[in-house]
C-alpha cells in the first residue's frame, strides 16, 4: 500500500515538471494523483508508478503486476522496452523523462512536501539502527515526537522495508506522514547504497552522524576506499548542516580531517580530540548485564547513565545519540534530567542483541549483526555474561561479500564452545557452498561444529543441548521478516522460532 500524499490533478502536476509525454489516446487531465511509488506490488489507482532502470531489471518489466494507476513515469529506455515488447499499458498515461532522478525528486517533493520537519541521519557500517532508535527514544522521553525510517518491525510484504534506506518515493512519503502526524523530527539511516544511488533525493540533513567503517558491501563497492567515499559524500556539498563523527577509528579521524573541523567529535580515546573545541569524551563500564556510560561535553558537563541493551556498543551509541540531539539544539541538562528520572535508558530493539529467557531456560540472544566486526562484538558481549557454554548459530548471506565468510567461521569457532552453521538469505547461491566457506574458517578440531541447513532446526538443536547457565547466540539474521531463497521471499521469523524452542525446553520435550 502506498502512503498517500498531497492530491493533485495529474495535468497540474505535469506542468510543474519538465517531463515529456508520449502520445496518448486517452484523456487524463481529470485524473488525480495522491501517491508515487517505485514498488509495483503496492501501486494503487491514484498513484504514479515510477519505472526506471534498476540494478538488474527495468521497472517497466513489472507493469504486469500493476492493476491500476494514475500514470507511469519512465525513461527513454523504458519507453523503448514497452514499444518493442508490447507490454500492456491499459491506456494509462505514460510520462517519459530525459532526467529520471531529478524529475522524480520534483514530483516527490510536490506530492510529499517535507519542508517543515527537522531531519537528521546516521551513516556507518554498524550502529546506525540502534543509534537512530536511541535518539528517537530520548526525544520521546522528553515529550518530543520523532518519526523514523527503519527496517525494524517491517513485514515480508513490504518490498522495500528491508532496505536500510527506502527508495526515494517511500522515504519522502514516510517523512511526509511523520510531518502530518505532527512529528518534530525525523531520523533516517543513510546507507552507502542510498547515497550512491540518490535515494536521499535532495534532502539536507540538519545533522549527519558517522559511527564507524569496517569491511562490508564489497560486492557493491569493490574496495574500502570506494565504500568510504560513498559515506563521505553525505558530509559534502551541503548535504548536511552539521556533523557528529566518531573518531575512534582511522576512517572517523580521516573523515573529520577531510570534511573540516566544524564537526562535533566523540571518542573513548582522549588523545584523538582533546585539542578540538567540540570534543566529547565517552567512557563505558559494565553494570550487571547492561552497560553504564559517562559522557563529558566540550564545556565539561558530565552525563552518567546506563542503557538496558546488552553490549558495550549500545552504550557508545547512546553517547553518540546524545551528541546528535545536542547538535539539534536540545539542552544537555534536559537530556541528563530525563535519564536520571528514568533510572537510565530502558528499551528493547527487536533483533539487536535481544534476549529471550523463560524460567530456568538457557539465555538466547538474537542479533542482526552480520559484518565481521558486528559478529565479534556480539560474541564478546555474549561470552562476557555466560557462566556455562556459549553456543553460536551463524549464517551468511548469499551474493554478499563472500570474503567475510571465512572470517565469520574463524571468529565463531574461537569464541564458541559449540557452533551450528546454518542457512540464511542464500538468494541464488548454493547454500551448502556458503556453509562450507564459513566452515573453512574454523580453526582447530571441528567436532564441536555442526552444519544444519534449516535455521529452525539449528535453533531447536542448540536449545536442546543447552543448560540453564548456557547462552545461545543466534547471529546474523535478527528480526528479518523473510528468507530470500531463489528469488522468493519466504515469510520467516527467527524470533518466533526461538520462542517456540524455549517453550519446548520448558515442556522438557
UniProtKB/Swiss-Prot annotation:
Pathway stated in the Swiss-Prot or TrEMBL entry: Cell wall biogenesis; peptidoglycan biosynthesis
Positions of modified residues (N6-carboxylysine): 231
GO CC field: cytoplasm
Binding site residues for ATP: 124-130
GO biological process, one term: cell wall organization
SUPFAM superfamilies (UniProt xref): MurD-like peptide ligases, catalytic domain, MurD-like peptide ligases, peptide-binding domain, MurE/MurF N-terminal domain
Enzyme Commission numbers on file: 6.3.2.-
The protein's role, per its UniProt record: Catalyzes the addition of an amino acid to the nucleotide precursor UDP-N-acetylmuramoyl-L-alanyl-D-glutamate (UMAG) in the biosynthesis of bacterial cell-wall peptidoglycan.
Stated name of the protein: UDP-N-acetylmuramyl-tripeptide synthetase
